[in-house]
Structure formats: C-alpha cells, structure tokens
C-alpha cells in the first residue's frame, strides 16, 4: 500500500431516536474500501449491526447450523453485540444493516468510510 494514501470519505455521529424505531436497511458502501463503526453508547437493549454473507452461492445452500452461538460457515448473517468503546472495521462491500432500535436505552455511534487512492 506504499503507493496509496488512505482518506476518510465520510464520518458522522448517529443517535437513534429516544422513542425507538431507528434502523438502517441492508446496504453496502460501494465507493469505499473500509467502513467502520465506533460505539459510544449502547447496551443489550439497543439496536445491533447485522453483517450478511456477500457470497452469491451462499443463498443457494442451506447448511445446518449445529450451534447458533458459534460463528460457522453455514451462517448467512452474523449479529454483533457491541459494548461502549467497540470499534468494528470491515470491507465496504460487506452487506450490513442495523436492526430496529427499541428506544429503551441510548444508542449512539460513529460511522466512517475510508478509501485507498493512488498517490
């Protein structure tokens, strides 16, 4: 990567409404390379990010899942339960969403996107 520079293309803070209902439908950040979230306020009663398997072939097979509490190749999606201070970074092409927030506890996080461009 010595011939590239990393640039933040976007960064913003989001807080889901105190009355609940905040969410993001499944999407990707097609024009970036790395995306991430830094969680400022969250709990077991707030929204969670869900990451979906981007492989098209995954939709065609339905492997049995032996233990839903462990990550395995059979899973189509992975739910992450962050704690305050959690930093998640992932490939921007990875489909992800935020489940509908209940509004019980405060939920605030920072989004950011990074792009590598030739120097």
Which residues are covered by each model-predicted region?
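A generic structural micro-feature
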Residues: 5, 28-32, 104-106
